[in-house]
Design a protein with these regions (language model features):
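A short, compositionally biased
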Residues: 197, 268-270, 412-417, 432-433
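Bacterial Sec-dependent N-terminal signal peptides
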Residues: 1-27
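Residue-level detector of functionally pivotal "anchor" positions at catalytic/ligand-binding pockets or at interdomain
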Residues: 389-390, 395-427
Length: 442
């Protein structure tokens, strides 16, 4: 039996970004987990905490102080320098931006036990495509070895973007640096177009099988009811939202034959996609993906459901076999209060079991409505319950929109902190509303 046509991660990944109001400590965790959907743009005044205290749960159902965190910002609210101190070790993270708010370099410094000297430990370096925001065309991850920066092979990569004479993207190839000056192609996306249209009529996604690239997914006969003409990347919710809507396509498969994709616009950002099989032997199967907007705060529910008729007849809504439901809720401040992933079985959607989840509770106690406390619970699959994870208390808020804060960085480091910065590997784009496909994010 065939499993899901497309993974939920690929289908949803590009919609996640960060709410600029979420505490700095939580931004890193939530973005890395890709569980945050884009929130509204910030107001002109950016009140940010220059200090946060992290507490962790203890065995007495209380909280124990874990570490102190200090920040300076640029005028856009991006973190210039973060300094964390848990009483045993200090960690400073400094990063530079380009004029578009894209992360250029990020250098991490740490102290050794018993010392207050911050020494460089690792560094990340990016370059970007000049036309597609946040699409890194190179990434280098380096660590200190014998006092010298050394690339960490297997983690560094480059992307080669090819365009036609009309400026449309025809292919993007990601290649991994696996040895000095040696790259191996890992994934490749190809797009074709008709006439002068900027909306693609075909899309192919290739992955490496060790020595060569082979086709993993191929979509042809793409028909759009509306398109912004902007680069959309891999198959995702971007194909059905934000001014784009793919009405139909054919998915080519050597194993399953042609799969017909038809989409219905439900209005207000909601849509439904049904995938059915043309092969007679697979008529008993189909897949339905639904994206539902739940309110004006950005809350949504996404479901990917697989139907299978055990008698071999055409699959109907009564033949639910398995699936996944992801629900993300936001409060009136556009901050996430719940992310929950549930597994669906033949027992029905109403009996779906929680597989993963994050729940946040905020205290908006600042003079200008700033978050002064955030308490987070993570779902424990073994305990089948939400368990306390962390508490962040923020204070000493500054209006960073009035100007850029400056910090002094060790001059012997490879990169001097003369530009704009961010925190702990988190790329905070200048525009909080941009979306980029998972297949192409670093």
């Amino acid at each position: 039996m065939r499993k899901f046509t497309l993974s939920v991660a690929l289908a949803l990944g590009c919609t996640y970004s960060t709410s600029a109001q979420i505490p700095s400590l939580l931004q890193s965790k939530l973005i890395n987990a890709q569980k945050i959907k884009t929130a509204a743009k910030e107001a002109n005044d950016l009140w940010k905490p220059s200090h946060e205290t992290l507490y962790m749960p203890n065995d007495n159902d209380g909280w124990t102080k874990d570490s102190e965190h200090y920040y300076t910002y640029d005028a856009s609210g991006n973190i210039l320098v973060s300094l964390s101190d848990d009483g045993k070790q200090k960690i400073k993270i400094v990063s530079t931006y380009d004029e578009n708010g894209q992360l250029l370099t990020e250098t991490t410094y740490r102290t050794d036990n018993g010392s207050d000297e911050l020494k460089p430990r690792m560094m990340k370096e990016y370059t970007y495509d000049p036309y597609i925001h946040d699409l890194a065309t190179s990434f280098f991850f380096s660590t200190i070895s014998n006092g010298e920066w050394q690339h960490f092979y297997g983690s560094c990569y480059k992307r080669t973007v090819e365009r036609d004479d009309q400026g449309r993207v025809t292919s993007i190839t990601k290649s991994i640096l696996d040895a000095p000056d040696h790259y191996t192609d890992q994934i490749k996306s190809l797009f074709t177009y008709n006439g002068t249209s900027k909306a693609p009529v075909s899309y192919e996604y290739q992955t490496s099988n060790g020595s060569t690239l082979t086709t993993s997914a191929k979509y042809v006969d793409l028909k759009w009811t509306k398109s912004t003409g902007e680069y959309l990347g891999a198959y995702s919710t971007n194909w059905f939202t934000n001014g784009n809507f793919l009405e139909s396509a054919t998915i080519k498969s050597d194993s399953y034959g042609d799969i017909l994709l038809t989409a219905t616009d439900k209005g207000n950002g909601s849509y439904e996609v049904e995938q059915t099989y043309t092969a007679e032997s697979l008529k008993s199967q189909k897949e339905i993906q639904k994206y539902e907007t739940l309110d004006d705060n950005g809350s949504f529910k996404y479901s990917d459901l697989f139907y299978f008729n055990i008698e071999g007849n055409a699959a109907t809504e009564d033949d639910l076999y398995q699936g996944t439901i992801i629900e993300t809720l936001y409060d009136d401040h556009k901050n996430i209060v719940l992310y929950e992933s549930r597994n669906v079985s033949q027992t029905g959607i109403e009996n779906a079991k929680i597989a993963d989840g994050i729940r946040n509770e905020y205290v908006y106690g600042g003079e200008h409505g700033e978050i002064t406390q955030t308490t987070t619970w993570n779902f424990s699959y073994n305990d089948n319950a939400y368990m306390p994870d962390s508490k962040v208390v923020a204070d000493d808020f500054r209006n960073v929109s009035t100007g850029i804060s400056h910090c002094t960085i060790q001059q012997e480091s490879k990169h001097n902190a003369s530009g704009v910065y961010t925190l702990q590997g988190v790329k905070i784009a200048q525009s909080a509303t941009a979306h980029y496909p998972t297949a192409y994010t670093s």
